[in-house]
């Protein structure tokens, strides 16, 4: 316990508040302290006790829970009886000499006589306090145990008159100070994160996939989430806990009390009431929300009214107002706005909250006379229960309740501020699901209208060409799928073999360097400042010598975190903060200490006068000013050197470049280098030598690249580009410009990159024509020179270095970083070299590729590269147009790279950590098969559907697609545009045999519709969407890795479902395509 630090300032302040109220009571609604002689509390050992007044008082005063501890507050002294270790901590409370502060006496437990001697001392102290009769206790607190029982017997024998002080102490602790408010804010932030990032998304996923999940399972998941860093806002998980078990209720059975328990019934997709609260440093918070799935207009109206009631209460929470008045005024508001709801309201609208989750004596109810004070924190909750929904189709949806709650802080001005500002309007909690049956009715009408327009205009023979083309595409798709199945079988086996060969390799733990300024006192400087006990900065040894208790103590500059200087009146202050365990560290600062158990200095502040006395050369503060300047200089120099050392520590030592004296060495002049060696861009020359390249800038800077360190070399011509370049992707980083680099590029510009818009131009201007001709000649000249250089290097190195040229015709747009660029495949890589930073993926290093967000209604998708080295971070390319999906698949398939696809974004960091933690277990559970489509017979179904040519209507599919992309067009204009596109010419008319056969098939199909009430939707365009369009998120085995999207789209689309065995299909918008539409809208 000696390592724990007491907040002495808070301890003094709070003890003085307790004694001030005791000596001169000011709380009008409770006078329990008025005639009290002494106060006693005991905290025993009981794991089942989560909240108690004794524990709350102890935490409020000391900041820590001390079990088996008796606290006695007498008129002029405070006594603590506890074990020896805890006494070491409590020694920090002694030697406080403030006026009006009681004396602190510490008693160590004596097990030889079972503390009878200590009990006698305490009872004597109680009897000597004032009259020694009336003892203030917490009547409802009951701790079992031998120690507690023995103390109770001693008290009973002494015949004190017990007075319950629970209410008055609770009211005393109710106004929070700044540190307490900060703790509650952090707890509220965690509550919101768990609710928004976990619970909300989990409920959405359950509804999306139509799964059956029990309420208690969801509750357990919330409790587990508080241990995960992504939900805890960077707070220490050891200081976090749930204030109560999360409550999830649905299906008609609702209890709007925080004593309710999540039952084992499955989640019902109707009204879902959720409540949860986190604790940080024992300070509680709460958030309650209600989700409405397909709510009726009446339900939406009731919910909107409930939100307005809560907003009205917030306006009434003003300091000086009685809580019963707040309740009555709220009741009057409800009677005025919606009198039918008065009987459905709860008995109270909230309660005070802090170290205890619920303070029963301070509630917003009809009988509470307590006055509101600034900085009180309340769990403000309002609800309406026992409501009926006559439009519900099932028994569970007939009865429902609405409930919302927040953690609020009473301020100086109205209204009170909400500390859990999670959105709660109907558009944020309403979930609107559109069934396929409703959608198909609309689609049937649309299809009939399009067919009618087609018959009037007639059909061209282009339809037969499209059908023939489609058959060929289906055959190609089947071959590709078959090849991918073969690759999938090989993937897991090769991965297991590779991991078995690699074995276990552990990273070396980095420890902060233990720097020693002087090995002996003889090395200490003998400067006058040192002798005069002034601050002295030793630049040579990078040490600051500071006077501490009259002794000069050296501190190496690496121990100093930061310094600050301020002038206040006649004094200058210099504050020096040190690194210590528990302090926040920078990204590049080592956080591990050689001796973490040692005693560390946190900060030191020096004060010196600015007043110059007679006879003095300068003011005393000149020493602090000079020290401040020198420390900054030495610190800057030290950090710069450390940064350079960090850059160098992972470097692999390279061989020495062997210069070739041959004058015929391949050489290119007037090249720029990326990244720049210095800030200013300079040209230079690149020359090939015996074992590597050397680049020399005009300033004389040298960069050497050895052949054996080149992983990939690229030559990109200037066709369609403004630069021509050579790019080297290295195996190991090299150092230049004081930084490490794995990608080095040499390039020159072709033509003018910028255009003078103010220049007068003419189509046939001779100067412009001459400039264009000159540019064409320059391009040809540069292309020839670079190509010749590459060929000479390949010949000289005997193909050790081979230059790849990107295939521009195979390129596709994507955003590997912030901006969209053109990604171009090479024979062994996927690259973008024009923009900086470059993007280079070596295909030999790729394990598999996964496509994310492959859905009908989205215009683009993401591509994830998983590397064979599983410890390496996955590479991501965002925003690839959906019409390039088949193109990318075909390229990957030709490179023998396994790919998979899904409708959602996955948490790849979590996936890769799971794999690296237990690779054997991962492959035993199927390995990468979790990314496969959910249906094994999907290919067979697709083939069967593709053979039913008479049921395929390309015009319908295309028009559906067009309507998704350009929804602002009218239906009539869509029909006309599509008809023009399909017919090819307005003059073509008449019907051929294929049209007549199609009409006959349509009549047969219509007959089937009448006989069977399950119409088959038109097929999608397989060329545009490929097999991805058949994937449904409902049964994906990768749900456990899904990352939770933060936003949900609120619009609906008319996309058709291609699945026959599902009554309802729900698709979920990705947060990156909020502008597009989906089958389900969420508000």
Swiss-Prot record:
GO terms for biological process: DNA repair; DNA replication; positive regulation of transcription elongation by RNA polymerase II; regulation of chromatin organization; transcription elongation by RNA polymerase II. One of its GO terms (cellular component) is nucleolus. Residues 466-504 form a coiled coil. The keyword DNA repair applies. Its main location: nucleus. Residues 988-1023, 1058-1076 have a biased composition (Basic and acidic residues). The keyword DNA repair applies. It comes from the Eukaryota. Keywords: Chromosome, Coiled coil, DNA damage, DNA repair, DNA replication, Nucleus, Phosphoprotein, Transcription, Transcription regulation. It holds the Pfam family FACT-Spt16_Nlob. It is found in: Nucleus; Chromosome. Component of the FACT complex, a stable heterodimer of dre4/spt16 and Ssrp. Interacts with TRL/GAGA. Component of the FACT complex, a general chromatin factor that acts to reorganize nucleosomes. The FACT complex is involved in multiple processes that require DNA as a template such as mRNA elongation, DNA replication and DNA repair. During transcription elongation the FACT complex acts as a histone chaperone that both destabilizes and restores nucleosomal structure. PANTHER family: CDC68 RELATED (PTHR13980), FACT COMPLEX SUBUNIT SPT16 (PTHR13980:SF15). This is FACT complex subunit spt16.
């Amino acid at each position: 316990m000696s390592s724990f630090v007491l907040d002495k300032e808070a301890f003094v302040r709070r003890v003085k508040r307790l004694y001030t109220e005791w000596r001169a009571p000011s709380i009008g609604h409770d006078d329990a302290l008025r005639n009290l002689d002494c106060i006693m509390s005991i905290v025993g050992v009981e794991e089942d006790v989560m909240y108690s007044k004794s524990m709350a008082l102890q935490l409020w005063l000391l900041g820590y829970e001390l079990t088996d501890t008796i606290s006695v507050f007498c008129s002029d002294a405070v006594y603590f009886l506890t074990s020896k270790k805890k006494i070491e901590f409590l020694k920090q409370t002694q030697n406080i000499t403030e006026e009006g502060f009681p004396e602190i006496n510490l008693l160590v437990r004596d097990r030889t006589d079972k503390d009878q001697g200590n009990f006698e001392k305490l009872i004597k102290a109680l009897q000597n306090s004032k009259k020694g009769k009336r003892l203030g206790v917490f009547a409802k607190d009951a701790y079992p145990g031998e120690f507690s029982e023995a103390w109770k017997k001693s008290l009973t024998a002494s015949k004190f008159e017990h007075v319950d002080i629970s209410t008055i102490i609770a009211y005393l602790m109710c106004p929070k100070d700044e540190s307490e408010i900060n703790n509650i804010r952090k707890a509220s932030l965690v509550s919101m994160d768990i609710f928004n990032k976990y619970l909300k998304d989990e409920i959405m996923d359950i509804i999306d996939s139509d799964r059956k999940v029990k309420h208690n399972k969801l509750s357990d998941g919330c409790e587990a989430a508080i241990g995960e860093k992504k939900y805890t806002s960077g707070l220490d998980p050891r200081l976090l806990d749930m204030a109560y078990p999360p409550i999830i209720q649905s299906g008609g059975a609702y209890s709007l009390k925080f004593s309710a328990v999540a039952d084992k019934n499955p989640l019902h997709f109707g009204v879902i009431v959720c409540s949860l609260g986190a604790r940080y440093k024992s300070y509680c918070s709460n958030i309650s929300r209600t989700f409405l799935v397909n709510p009726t207009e009446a339900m939406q109206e009731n919910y909107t009214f409930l939100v307005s009631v809560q907003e009205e209460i917030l306006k009434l929470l003003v300091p000086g107002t009685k809580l019963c008045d707040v309740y009555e005024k709220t009741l009057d508001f409800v009677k005025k706005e919606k009198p039918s709801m008065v009987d459905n309201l709860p008995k109270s609208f909230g309660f005070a909250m802090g170290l205890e989750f619920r303070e029963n004596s301070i509630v917003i109810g009809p009988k509470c006379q307590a006055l509101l004070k600034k900085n009180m924190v309340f769990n403000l909750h309002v609800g309406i229960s026992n409501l009926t929904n006559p439009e519900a189709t099932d028994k569970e949806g007939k009865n429902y309740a609405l409930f919302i709650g927040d953690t609020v802080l009473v301020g100086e001005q109205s209204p009170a501020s909400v500390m859990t500002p999670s959105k709660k309007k109907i558009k944020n909690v309403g979930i609107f699901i559109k069934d396929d049956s409703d959608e198909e009715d609309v689609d049937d009408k649309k299809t009939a209208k399009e067919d009618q327009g087609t018959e009037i205009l007639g059909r061209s023979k282009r339809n037969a060409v499209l059908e023939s083309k489609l058959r060929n595409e289906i055959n190609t798709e089947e071959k590709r799928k078959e090849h991918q199945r073969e690759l999938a079988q090989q993937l897991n086996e090769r991965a297991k073999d590779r991991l078995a060969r690699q074995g276990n390799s552990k990273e070396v733990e980095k420890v902060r360097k233990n720097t020693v300024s002087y090995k002996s006192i003889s090395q200490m400087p003998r400067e006058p400042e040192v002798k005069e006990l002034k601050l002295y900065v030793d630049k040579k040894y990078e040490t600051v010598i500071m006077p501490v208790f009259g002794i000069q103590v050296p501190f190496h500059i690496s121990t100093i975190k930061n310094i600050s200087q301020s002038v206040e009146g006649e004094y200058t202050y210099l504050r020096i903060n040190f690194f210590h365990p528990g302090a926040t560290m920078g990204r590049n600062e080592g956080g591990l200490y050689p001796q973490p158990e040692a005693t560390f200095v946190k900060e030191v502040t020096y004060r010196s006068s600015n007043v110059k006395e007679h006879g003095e050369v300068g003011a005393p503060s000149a020493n602090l000013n000079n020290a401040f300047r020198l420390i900054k200089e030495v610190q800057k120099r030290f950090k710069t050197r450390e940064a350079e050392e960090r850059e160098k520590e992972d470097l692999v030592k390279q061989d020495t470049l062997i210069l070739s004296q041959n004058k015929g060495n391949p050489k290119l002049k007037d090249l720029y280098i990326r990244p720049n060696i210095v800030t200013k861009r300079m040209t230079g020359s690149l020359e090939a030598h015996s074992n590597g390249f050397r680049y020399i800038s005009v300033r004389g800077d040298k960069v050497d690249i050895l052949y054996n360190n080149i992983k990939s070399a690229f030559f990109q011509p200037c066709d369609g580009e403004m630069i021509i370049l050579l790019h080297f992707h290295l195996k190991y980083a090299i150092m230049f410009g004081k930084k490490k680099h794995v990608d080095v590029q040499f390039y020159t510009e072709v033509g003018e990159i910028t255009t003078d818009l103010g220049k007068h131009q003419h189509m046939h201007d001779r100067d412009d024509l001459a400039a264009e001709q000159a540019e064409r000649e320059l391009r040809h000249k540069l292309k020839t020179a670079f190509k010749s250089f590459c060929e000479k290097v390949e010949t000289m190195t005997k193909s050790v270095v081979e230059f790849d040229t990107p295939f521009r015709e195979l390129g596709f747009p994507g955003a590997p970083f912030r901006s969209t660029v053109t990604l171009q495949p090479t024979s062994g890589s996927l690259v973008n070299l024009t923009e900086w930073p470059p993007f280079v993926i070596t295909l030999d290093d790729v394990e598999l590729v996964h496509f994310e967000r492959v859905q009908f209604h989205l215009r683009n998708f993401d591509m994830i590269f998983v590397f064979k080295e599983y410890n390496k971070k996955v590479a991501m390319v965002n925003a690839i147009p959906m019409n390039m999906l088949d193109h990318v698949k075909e390229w990957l398939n030709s490179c023998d790279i396994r790919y998979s696809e899904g409708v959602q974004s996955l948490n790849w960091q979590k996936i890769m950590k799971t794999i690296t933690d237990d690779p054997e277990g991962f492959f035993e559970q199927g390995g990468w098969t979790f990314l496969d489509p959910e249906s094994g017979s999907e290919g067979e179904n697709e083939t069967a559907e593709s053979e039913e040519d008479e049921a395929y209507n390309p015009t319908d599919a295309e028009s559906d697609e067009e309507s998704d992309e350009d929804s602002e067009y009218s239906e009539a204009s869509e029909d006309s545009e599509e008809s023009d596109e399909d017919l090819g010419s307005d003059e073509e008319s008449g019907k051929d045999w294929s049209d007549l056969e199609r009409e006959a098939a349509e009549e047969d199909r219509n007959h089937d519709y009448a006989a069977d009430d399950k119409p088959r939707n038109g097929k999608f365009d397989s060329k545009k969407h490929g097999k991805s369009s058949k994937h449904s998120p409902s049964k994906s085995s990768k749900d456990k890795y899904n990352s939770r999207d933060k936003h949900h789209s609120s619009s609906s689309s008319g996309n058709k479902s291609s699945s026959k065995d599902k009554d309802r299909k729900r698709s979920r918008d990705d947060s990156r395509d909020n502008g597009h539409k989906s089958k389900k809208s969420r508000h």
